[in-house]
Amino acid sequence: MVYDIEYDVVVIGGGHAGIEAALASAKLGTKTALITIDKEKIGLMPCNPSIGGIAKGIVVREVDALGGEMAKAIDQTGIQFKVLNTRKGPAVRSPRAQADKEEYRKYMVNKTNNTENLTVIEDEVIDIVLKENKNEVDGVITDKGLKIKTKAVVVTTGTFLNGLIHIGDKRFPAGRMEEKPSTKLPEFYKRAGFELFRFKTGTPARLDKNTINFSILEEAPGDNPPPKFSFWTEPKGSYWFKEKDQIPCYITYTTPETHRIIKENLHRTALYGGAITGIGPRYCPSVEDKIVKFEGKDRHTVWLEPETRDGISIYPNGLSTSLSEEIQWQMYRSIPGLENVVLLKPAYAIEYDIVMPTELYPTLETKRIRGLYHAGNFNGTTGYEEAAGQGIVAGINAALRALGKDEPFIIRRDEAYIGVMIDDLTTKGVIEPYRLFTSRSEYRLHLRQDNAILRLYQKAYNIGMLNEEEYKFVKETEEEIKNWINIYKETFIKDGDKKVSIFTYLQKPEVDIQKLKEMGIAVPESDYIQEEIEINVKYDGYLEREEKLNEKMKYLEGIKIPEDIDYSQVAGLRKEIVQKLTKFKPMTLGQASRLEGITPAAITALLVHIEKMREKRKTG
C-alpha cells in the first residue's frame, strides 16, 4: 500500500485514555497522531462532571506520578475538592473533585494541540492495515481517505464502536448523544479474529439549575483546605491548595412516589423492556435497576452536581435511566427540590462493543497483532480515571515499540492500582464493566493516595516520563522523609517515668505531628512530609507485614516465561492447564499463578521447566 504520511504512533480516540496515550507517546519523543472525530471534544466528560473517588483518585495521582496530565487538568479546572473516607485509615482515602467540564475540555484541547511531537487530526479511523504476515500493524485508513503508515496503534474508542443509544423504546446509532458511532472499525476486529462483546452504560438527564429549589436541600461543601491531585501543582510537593474557591453540591433523595412511577413503567425502559442486550455496570446501576434489586429500600441518595462554575446544567448523580423521556419528567419531578425541574437533556443508556481484555499482554498490546494496543472502555472498564491509567501505559508501550526498545513498561500489582487493574483485566477478563476499588488490591497499605509519587517516580524517570529537575525534587523529598524518621528513631524523650524514642511515642493513637510541635520537638516544614512521616510511623508494623507477604509475589513476577515455551512439553501439567496457559500467554510466573485453575503444583512444574530451558540455552 502507498501511504500519504507516516507517524510512529497513531492514537484513535480523544477521550481520557486517548489523551494520556497520545501525550505519553509524544513525551517519549515519538511522532504521534491523535485521530478523533471532533477535535473540539477532546477531554469531553460525557457522564459525571468529576474526577477521582474511591480508588479512582489514587489512580489519578498515579497517572500524575508517571508524568500524565489528568491531575494537573483537574487542579486547574476543578470547582470542588474533597478527600473521601477520611474517617477510615489512610489506605482507603481518595481525593475527588467536581470539574468545570467545559474548562476541563478546553484545557485538554489546548494541551493536545500544543504538545511537541503530537498532531491532532480530525477524522475517523475506519480500518487498521496489517503487514503481509497479518500479525503486525502497518498503518491505518481514515474516513476521509487518508492512509497513514505507523509502527503502533492505540485504540481508545470508548463507547463509539457500534454505539446504540436507548431512551425508552426509542433507539438510534450514536457514539455519544449527538455524535455518530464507529461502524466500520469493528469490521477490522471481526476479520482479525477478535470476538466482540456488548456492554452497556448510562447517564442521567441534565437539569436546569434555575428550576431547582435548593433552599430545602442538604448542602455538600468541599473540604477546607481543599486537596489537590497533582504533586506538581503549586505549592509544589504538597497535596493541599493554599486557596481554592469552591462551589457546593446538594443532596436529595428519591421518594415512594419516585419508586411507584419507575415500577409502573419498567416495561417501558430499554433495560427491562428487553431492548438492551449489553451487560451494564454493577457498581453504577440505573435507578430502575436499584429500585428492582433493592426493593426494600424506601429511598436512594441523589447528588446534585454543577457541571460548570457559571452555567445552569446540573448532573443528578444516582439517577441514570433508560426510561422514556415523558416518564423521566414525572420521575425527576417526584423528588424533593425538583418539583418544578426542567430537563435540559434526557437520560439515556448506550450499548457498545468491547474486546475481551484477556486478548492483551500487561503492556496492553494485543496478543494477536504486534503493535496494536487497547485502552479505556474498549477494554471493558468504566470511568475516566481507569481509562487514563490504561491510556498512559498503552501510550508508553506503543512509543517504546516504535522506538525499538526491547524492555516493555509493566506496572505490577504491588506497585500501583493501575497495575492491579491491568492485571485483573488481562488475567481474569470482564463479565461486566470493570470498576476499580481498594478492595481489589492485596497491598492497600502500600498503595495509598499520598505516596503515589514516591512509588512510581523512579519508573517514570527511567523511561523518560519525568525530567531531571522533577526527579531530583522527588528524590530529595523521599530522602528528607527517611532522614526525619531516622532522627525520630534515634532521639529519645520522657514519656511518664520512662524514656522512649520519638518514633515510638508518635505511634501512640493520641499523638500526632502537631502534638510533637506543641511539645517543642522539631518537625519538618512541609505538610506533605509531615503526613508521610506520620503514616509510616503509625503503620510501621502493618507495612512491614504486608511487605513480607509481597516478597513471594515479587519473586514470581521476576521470572519471565520465554515467548517460545511449549506448554505441552512441561512435565506434570494437566491438559486443561496446558490449554489455558497456551490461550492466555502469561508473561511471568506471577501472572500465570493468578489465572483461574492454575495450581501451585503447576507453577512449580513451570519453574523447573523454565530453569531447564535457561540451562539449555547457556550450554548451547
From Swiss-Prot:
Origin: domain of life: Bacteria
Residues that coordinate or bind NAD(+): 280-294
Chief site of localization: cytoplasm
Compartment(s) where it occurs, according to its Swiss-Prot or TrEMBL record: Cytoplasm
BP GO annotations: tRNA methylation; tRNA wobble uridine modification
Family classification: Belongs to the MnmG family.
Protein name: tRNA uridine 5-carboxymethylaminomethyl modification enzyme MnmG
